[in-house]
């Protein structure tokens, strides 16, 4: 029998397609890209390591030839694909029909080197009909699409690898720059600047409830007083909070009411008679929205479902791979003839002929740069499955997103909504005031009635309940005729303040990038994830708040490399990539122009070389906060975080404080808090100074004035740095404390990030009192360890969270690990990624797919090397050597040598309310220390053998303690 190998991107997609193809076909996944540019020096092949261009992974001297490598975690899988290819009679590359998919197919062809016929198969939905049609109509690999993807990858590498080191040297270590991420960051920063410069304006008006002779009531609002319009929000200047000036530099002719004036007017208007001066009614129609493209799906996923962009795309990916929707990365809103017929048929059957648009609706892409042709995102197949029919098949996220996609697709072929807009003006006169006669007033009342809902029966943008939304959209006014009188029954003064422009949410940032022509459907979610992962933005509710680091980075790029973060320039790069994809531009000349420059234009490489010396690191890191101007307070971004200074006084800026929330009173308060060094005295045993410090994560005490410090300990709740005594500081520095030995293991009392706890081997238990750390005994500790272990806020950790059973493989368990929930089958583990759900909604096939894609064998712990003898340490200011005291020694002296740490997932550093996780564990310096003899109460000297603080480079230690930049 003929054996045809079909390769797609993901295991889930492979399983769905294999069901449709049947015998004679083997469907395997590539698990994404199999090759890429080297991610580190370790991945660069030995023969290229000495090449000047090797770090880029691009030979800039040879037409930007890419150095592609198979990463270590893909080598085993690539070997498997090679074996399958060798046994196949034909190879079909069925990756996605876009640039990335075309590139994956090309890389597979290059790496597998098949000796059998090769075909390229493309489809936009995973249904039996679509797959069989694609098999019957193969094509060749589109080299133009491959060239465009290679150009995009090269651009990103050149931009990132050239610009990021500038940020490391001039702003802070470990920052990154990116072709799109830096522009997205600039958008966030510019919006925050608008908020920081914003000055609120205030005004008052009057809200009325009027009644007709028939006792029908309706709302109205005071709009004019003595023929002059009342001020509204649009009349105020955002920079001053005052009324805008007209062409003659005079404020606009409007009335600004104070609270007192508004209350006086309201009292004089209550129960007044008003006359209908005019009543207008105009019809309106509203057309349905086009079916979803990637950006609008992400925007509505956020507005309607509360999903982030990445969550939306994860759910959409699963729906696509399961055969429920069409391809989810598209900027075309068009529907195929088959889909149009399916939508129209469903409208007719579910809503009736009256709700069907007279003619099929055809939608064209708004973007002139719409990528390779796809359909809109819609339910898959020639007939759409209703959401109700899929309730038992889809997980929560998948069902809710499918419901959204289905409604939008069906509504796109429905009839227009029709209605009427009403506008009524009421004139009247106030009663006399104490200061004179009454005043003429004019009130406005507006209404909206929907006569025929049309497509709104199925879909209302921004709402999850169309019927409720329709009611909210209607404000019905009673029939009113000119000269008819009504009564102003209730008059309520209403105060208002202008609001700063709203921060970007994930949805509005996608909309903003799309409006600028920046990014593509495949990149929006990753851009948003990247700017958060890199520390340029943080979520506050649904808003994206730029960090101070983002301000400094954007300032540097705007002032010295303005073109690289220019919106038009970045959009032009997207257009150029489209031109390469269409075969109208060539990759190599384009990259040469970008990197080296041409026609008098300077490329990125010479630009950085010429600008580097001109960059004033202090200037770009100094941020002039509008609310602090004239106060002498400067805000800076140091190598270890943001801080402010006033003369010699410095203070860290809390990480959770948004830039626009830093006001002068708050800044003065932060600067007045204890900061800097507080000498407390000399430790009588070691001769080292004891110093109190204010760190980013709270106050702490430090033993020694050398760098790095000998020992540190955070203060307990209730301790005050300004009144802390030497005796108290020395007591804190005895922690971690060796309590004794239980079941052959040392028991330690420690103060950690989440409070006081006991540690025995790999087991730990929280205790209720910080002070108890100094007095807890072995019997009390053993009683604590006999209690069930609790994690977080009391959720007991007991066995797997869920178990997935399979007929063809061992069960997969969902467990809670120290780095979050993970899947395991006993041989491989796969951690659920950041932002993924807890796993409660995972289906068995999801668990299998994740484990197959990301599963890794647990790493075995390397055998420990023989510990080196610690060098003696000298006390500061003295020539004596501090000797090590045995734990069994009866003397209760406390000494300084490095201390042995019990194994624990998170090592508390400086007991300063923060922790160092596994990436820094390699920095731990182990020192040989004898264990305390069993069943002996430890002396004070045992503290010298307590868990060691992590031995870090001073730069890292400063970063974690939050020490102010010099």
Where are these regions (language model features)?
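Basic, low-complexity terminal or inter-domain segments flanking catalytic cores
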Residues: 2-5, 15-16, 25, 164, ...
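C-terminal or mid-to-C-terminal helical accessory/interaction module adjacent to the motor/catalytic core
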Residues: 80, 86-87, 126-210, 281-285
């Amino acid at each position: 029998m003929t054996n045809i190998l079909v390769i797609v991107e993901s295991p889930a997609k492979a399983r769905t397609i294999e069901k449709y193809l049947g015998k004679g076909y083997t469907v395997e996944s590539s698990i994404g890209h199999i090759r890429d540019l080297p991610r580190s020096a370790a991945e660069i092949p030995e023969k290229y390591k000495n090449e000047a261009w090797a770090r880029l992974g691009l030979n800039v001297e040879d037409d930007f030839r890419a150095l592609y490598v198979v990463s270590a975690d893909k080598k085993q899988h690539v070997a498997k694909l090679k074996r399958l290819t060798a046994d196949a009679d034909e190879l079909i590359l069925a990756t996605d029909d876009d640039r990335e998919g075309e590139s994956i197919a090309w890389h597979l062809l290059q790496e597998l080197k098949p000796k059998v016929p090769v075909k390229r198969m493309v489809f936009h939905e995973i249904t039996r009909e679509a797959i069989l049609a694609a098999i019957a109509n193969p094509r060749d690999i589109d080299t133009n699409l491959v060239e465009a993807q290679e150009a995009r990858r090269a651009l990103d590498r050149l931009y990132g690898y050239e610009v990021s080191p500038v940020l490391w040297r001039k702003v802070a270590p470990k920052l990154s720059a990116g072709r799109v991420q830096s522009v997205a960051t600039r958008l966030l920063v510019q919006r925050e600047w608008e908020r920081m410069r914003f000055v609120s304006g205030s005004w008052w008006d009057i809200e009325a409830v009027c009644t007709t002779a028939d006792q029908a009531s309706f709302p109205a609002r005071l709009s004019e007083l003595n023929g002059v319009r009342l001020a509204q929000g649009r009349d105020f200047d955002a920079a001053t909070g005052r009324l805008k000036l007209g062409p003659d530099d005079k404020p606009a002719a409007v009335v600004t009411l104070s609270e007192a004036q508004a209350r006086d007017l309201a009292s004089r208007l209550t129960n007044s008679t008003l006359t209908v001066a005019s009543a207008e009614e105009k019809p309106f129609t509203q057309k349905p929205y086009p079916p979803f493209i990637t950006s609008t799906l992400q925007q509505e996923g956020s507005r309607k479902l509360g999903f982030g962009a990445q969550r939306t795309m994860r759910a959409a990916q699963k729906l696509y791979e399961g055969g429920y929707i069409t391809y989810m990365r598209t900027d075309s809103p068009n529907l195929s003839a088959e889909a149009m017929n399916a939508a129209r048929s469903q409208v007719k059957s579910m809503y009736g002929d009256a709700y069907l648009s007279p003619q099929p609706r055809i939608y064209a892409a708004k973007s002139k740069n719409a990528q390779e042709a796809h359909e809109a995102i819609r339910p898959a197949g020639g007939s759409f499955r209703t959401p109700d029919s899929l309730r038992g098949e889809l997980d929560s996220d998948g069902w809710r997103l499918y419901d959204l996609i289905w409604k939008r697709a069906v509504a796109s072929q429905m009839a227009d909504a029709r209605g009427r807009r009403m506008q009524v003006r009421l004139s009247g006169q106030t009663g006399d005031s104490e200061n004179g006669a009454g005043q003429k007033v004019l009130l406005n009342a507006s209404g909206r009635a929907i006569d025929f809902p049309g497509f709104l029966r199925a879909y209302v943008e921004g709402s999850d309940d169309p019927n409720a939304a329709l009611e909210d959209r209607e404000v019905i006014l009673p029939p009113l005729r000119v000269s008819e009188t009504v009564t102003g029954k209730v008059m309520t003064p209403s105060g208002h303040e202008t609001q700063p422009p709203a921060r970007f949410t994930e949805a509005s940032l996608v909309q903003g990038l799309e409006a600028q022509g920046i990014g593509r459907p495949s990149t929006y979610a990753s851009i948003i994830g990247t700017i958060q992962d890199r520390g340029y933005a943080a979520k506050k509710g649904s808003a994206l708040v730029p960090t101070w680091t983002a301000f400094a980075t954007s300032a540097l790029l705007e002032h010295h490399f303005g073109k690289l973060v220019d919106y038009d320039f970045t959009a032009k790069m997207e257009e150029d990539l489209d031109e390469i994809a269409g075969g109208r531009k060539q990759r190599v000349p384009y990259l040469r122009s970008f990197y080296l420059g041409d026609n008098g234009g300077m490329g990125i490489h010479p630009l950085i070389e010429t600008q580097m010396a001109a960059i004033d690191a202090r200037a770009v890191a100094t941020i002039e906060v509008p609310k602090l101007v004239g106060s002498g307070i400067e805000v800076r971004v140091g190598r270890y975080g943001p801080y402010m200074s006033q003369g010699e006084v410095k203070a860290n800026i809390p990480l959770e404080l948004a830039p626009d929330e830093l006001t002068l009173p708050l800044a003065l308060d932060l600067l007045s808090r204890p900061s800097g060094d507080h000498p407390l005295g000399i430790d009588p045993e070691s001769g080292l100074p004891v110093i109190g410090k204010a760190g980013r994560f709270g106050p702490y005490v430090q033993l020694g004035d050398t760098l790095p410090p000998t020992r540190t300990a955070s203060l307990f709740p209730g301790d005050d740095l300004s009144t802390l005594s030497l005796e108290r500081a020395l007591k804190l520095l005895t922690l971690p404390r060796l309590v004794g030995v239980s079941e052959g293991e040392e028991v330690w009392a420690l103060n950690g990030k989440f409070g006081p706890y006991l540690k025995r081997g790999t087991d730990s238990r929280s205790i209720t009192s910080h002070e108890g750390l100094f007095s807890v005994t072995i019997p009390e500790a053993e009683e604590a360890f006999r209690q069930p272990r609790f994690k977080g806020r009391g959720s007991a950790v007991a066995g797997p969270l869920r178990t997935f059973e399979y007929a063809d493989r061992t069960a997969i368990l969902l467990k809670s690990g120290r780095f979050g929930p993970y899947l395991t089958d006993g041989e491989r583990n796969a951690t659920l990624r950041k932002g993924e759900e807890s796993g409660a909604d995972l289906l068995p096939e999801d668990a299998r797919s994740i484990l197959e894609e990301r599963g890794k064998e647990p790493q075995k712990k390397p055998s420990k090397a023989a510990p080196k003898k610690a060098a003696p340490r000298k006390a500061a200011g003295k020539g004596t050597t501090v000797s090590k005291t045995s734990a069994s020694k009866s003397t209760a002296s406390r000494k300084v040598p490095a201390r042995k740490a019990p194994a624990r997932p998170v090592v508390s550093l400086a007991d300063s309310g923060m922790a160092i996780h596994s990436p820094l564990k390699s920095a731990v310096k182990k020192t040989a220390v004898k264990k305390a003899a069993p069943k002996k109460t430890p002396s004070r000297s045992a503290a010298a053998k307590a868990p060691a603080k992590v031995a870090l480079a001073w730069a890292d230690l400063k970063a974690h303690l939050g020490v102010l930049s010099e």
